[in-house]
A protein has these predicted regions:
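Compact beta-sheet-dominated domain cores in extracellular/mature segments
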Residues: 2-104
Length: 104
């Protein structure tokens, strides 16, 4: 009977584990603020982790008020890193300015 109980517990744990979403499914909690030279102050609320997000007309400054690191990129496709902002960090950028961001 002990083997049956252990087996049931193991199957239940496995079912629970496989039902959990992967890390890319999570959203960063909080707001990412940035300033675009042409568009002014903008923000992203609870952005998805792992998704490359366009910064409208680029960002000359950014503030990461999410609970996840934000990696900024000079290009629009998240391929040319411009720097990383940990939760609570901010940064101003000179030329060239970042044009995309990815969380996680």
């Amino acid at each position: 009977m002990k083997t049956t109980y252990t087996s049931k517990a193991a199957r239940a744990a496995l079912a629970l584990f496989t039902a959990l979403p992967t890390s890319t499914a999570y959203a960063a909690n909080g707001t990412f603020f940035y300033h675009s030279p042409q568009s002014g102050d903008l923000e992203m609320e609870d952005p998805d982790n792992g998704e490359c997000r366009l910064l409208l007309q680029g960002a000359d400054s950014a503030l990461n008020q999410t609970d996840t690191k934000a990696t900024l990129y000079f290009d629009q496709g998240c391929e040319e890193p411009a720097g990383t902002l940990l939760p609570g960090q901010s940064k101003s950028f000179g030329a060239p300015i970042p044009h995309s961001v990815q969380f996680g």
